């Protein structure tokens, strides 16, 4: 039917007959000549329908946007002054000799070049939305990324092995999606949150290097830019230490960016430990494009009269930090007030600040309502510690460390990305990757009054930290590592526990009894007793990588058929009700069901 793609038709085909298939992107009647912009996945080509060919011209008069056509014609130069440098085919046009309507179209609910469509409209009519060039480009880049990943891993000796989609429910942080078993009444499968345990078992089984590009499922609370199903580049390898694993996969990401975007990422990636990341940026995935850092002022604030500062400085797990904004003294009060409202989202009760007008004058050179409640020695130490200069602004965070880190960490990014930040050189618009390492092995859950695994309970402790799991879990560090790029976690992993007795120690630290551990993880504990090799791995979020590479506004723009923030598919209206007969077969009865809000 077709000899050439529309978007690839060029001067190389001048005076040749081509057959094209595609959709009417736009039809223009110029009083005697009809122009059709015909579109396929490769782009557009201009087709000319001349009244001298009566049958072609008559058919062209009837076509409308999104009609599916087959056109045969001669490639010729466009008339002088009508070329389009934005198109590969912009120097030529096709004079139609034949025009066949393969399928007409009803009037589309929107124009494909409308950039102001709501996401609801786009997702409801996803098939049409996917015809848009931007969506075509996004998904083709996604394909290219997966191909580059496969080529790299294949060359490194990794084997693509599928793991089960119907598996056992085990705690990994989020809620599982459960699948009732009809033939095993009262029992449920779970859809995997990750192939974590299976890939470890594959290492015990001597497959040495495994990978899989697979779907994972998490029944999480509603959050922006999260999907209940997502795609993971999942990898595991035996007989490699933490540094070797990081080096290997850093090379993979560097190659993907080079071959897909022609971007040279730094070699090697910088490495930062978790404590430094939290101390300087309030985040374990800091955006290194932003040139702002925390200054810890906790010790300085312990004896000041300003109770907001001294109270936080003296409380357990309290923290006081300063965020110096060079040139921020020029920031209008309205912008400062807006930032005050912004940090409230993260639990901050306010946003104190000091403008440094003339630091040589001491207290008299500082402008802020809080200055009167801070003694001269503390003020001098604040200026010295932050390195503030005339014309600078210092924001302060004072509260529990988590609130300060969340609020001032978000403020740091907000200021850096603002027009003010970009105009004042506080933001570098480039790719800034980073490894974050030495994560805490455990974190304390105040609600349940027990320790939980920071990553997952199969992460190995750092050398020399094994005994801390029982004596001081809060000081125990792990062999975990995250790859961060421009404030996003691209992937994370760890060296795994390969000895059953160490795995049992972790379960004890997490208050998982031997009986519960055997019930939930007995298959893993048993496997570890058969000479399990040292092993570790990493998993990358494919959706997130492609979102960053395309510059898409939402992760939903790089997934063909995504769910909404309410975990619904507006195209198919999933999830849906099922009939009573199906429920009875599954031994399920619904109770107190609330109406589902669609959209």
From Swiss-Prot:
PROSITE patterns: AA_TRNA_LIGASE_II. It comes from the Bacteria. Residues 196-199 are annotated as: Aspartate. Transmembrane segments: none annotated. SUPFAM superfamilies: Class II aaRS and biotin synthetases, GAD domain-like, Nucleic acid-binding proteins. The record marks 30, 81 as: Important for tRNA non-discrimination. It is an enzyme of class 6 (ligase). ATP binds at residues 218-220, 227, 489, 541-544. One of its GO terms (molecular function) is aspartate-tRNA ligase activity. Keywords: Aminoacyl-tRNA synthetase, ATP-binding, Cytoplasm, Ligase, Nucleotide-binding, Protein biosynthesis. L-aspartate binds at residues 172, 218, 455, 496. One of its GO terms (biological process) is aspartyl-tRNA aminoacylation. PANTHER family: ASPARTATE--TRNA LIGASE, MITOCHONDRIAL, ASPARTYL/LYSYL-TRNA SYNTHETASE. This is Aspartate--tRNA(Asp/Asn) ligase.
């Amino acid at each position: 039917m077709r000899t050439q793609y529309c978007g690839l038709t060029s001067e190389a085909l001048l005076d040749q007959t081509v057959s094209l298939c595609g959709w009417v992107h736009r039809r223009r009647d110029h009083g005697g000549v009809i122009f059709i912009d015909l579109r396929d996945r490769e782009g557009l080509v201009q087709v000319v329908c001349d009244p001298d060919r009566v049958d072609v011209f008559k058919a062209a008069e009837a076509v409308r946007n999104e009609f599916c056509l087959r056109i045969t014609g001669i490639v010729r130069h466009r008339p002088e002054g009508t070329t389009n440098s934005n198109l590969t085919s912009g120097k030529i046009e096709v004079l139609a000799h034949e025009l066949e309507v393969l399928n007409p179209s009803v009037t589309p609910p929107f124009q494909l070049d409308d950039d102001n469509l709501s996401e609801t409209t786009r997702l409801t009519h996803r098939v049409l939305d996917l015809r848009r060039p931007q969506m075509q480009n996004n998904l083709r880049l996604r394909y290219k990324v997966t191909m580059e990943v496969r080529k790299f891993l294949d060359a490194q000796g990794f084997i693509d092995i599928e793991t089960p989609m119907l598996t056992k429910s085990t705690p990994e942080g989020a809620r599982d999606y459960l699948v009732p078993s009809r033939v095993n009444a009262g029992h449920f499968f779970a859809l995997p949150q990750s192939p974590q345990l299976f890939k470890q078992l594959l290492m015990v089984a001597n497959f040495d290097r495994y990978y899989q590009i697979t779907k994972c499922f998490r029944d999480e609370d509603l959050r922006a830019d999260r999907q209940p199903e997502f795609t993971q580049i999942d990898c595991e390898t035996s007989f490699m230490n933490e540094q070797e694993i990081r080096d290997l996969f850093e090379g993979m990401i560097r190659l993907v960016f080079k071959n897909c975007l022609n971007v040279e990422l730094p070699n090697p990636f910088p490495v930062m430990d978790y404590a430094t990341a939290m101390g300087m940026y309030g985040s374990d995935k800091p955006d290194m494009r932003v040139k702002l850092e925390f200054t810890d002022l906790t010790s300085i604030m312990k004896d000041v009269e300003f109770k907001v500062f001294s109270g936080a400085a003296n409380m357990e797990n309290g923290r006081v930090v300063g965020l110096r904004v060079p040139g921020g003294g020029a920031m209008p009060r309205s912008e400062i007030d807006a930032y005050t409202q912004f940090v409230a989202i993260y639990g901050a009760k306010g946003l104190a600040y000091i403008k440094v007008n003339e630091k040589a004058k001491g207290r008299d050179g500082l402008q802020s309502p809080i200055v009167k409640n801070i003694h001269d020695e503390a003020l001098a130490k604040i200026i010295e510690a932050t390195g503030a200069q005339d014309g600078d602004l210092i924001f302060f965070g004072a509260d529990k460390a988590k609130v300060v880190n969340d609020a001032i960490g978000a403020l740091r990014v907000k200021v850096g990305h603002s027009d003010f930040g970009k105009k004042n050189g506080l933001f570098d618009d480039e790719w800034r990757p980073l490894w974050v390492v030495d994560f805490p092995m455990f974190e304390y859950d105040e609600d349940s009054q027990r320790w939980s695994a920071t990553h997952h309970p199969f992460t190995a402790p750092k050398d020399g930290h094994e005994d801390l799991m029982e004596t001081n879990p809060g000081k125990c560090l792990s062999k975990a590592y995250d790859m961060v790029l421009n404030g996003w976690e691209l992937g994370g992993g760890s060296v795994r526990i390969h000895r059953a007795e160490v795995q049992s120690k972790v379960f004890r630290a997490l208050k998982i009894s031997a009986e519960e551990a055997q019930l939930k993880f007995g298959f893993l504990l048993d496997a570890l007793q058969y000479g399990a090799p040292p092993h570790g791995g990493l998993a990358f979020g494919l959706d997130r990588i492609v979102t960053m590479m395309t510059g898409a506004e939402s992760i939903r723009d790089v997934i063909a058929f995504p769910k909404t923030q309410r975990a619904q598919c507006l195209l198919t209206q999933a999830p849906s009700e099922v009939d009573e007969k199906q429920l009875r077969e599954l031994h399920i009865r619904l109770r107190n069901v609330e109406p589902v809000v669609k959209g």
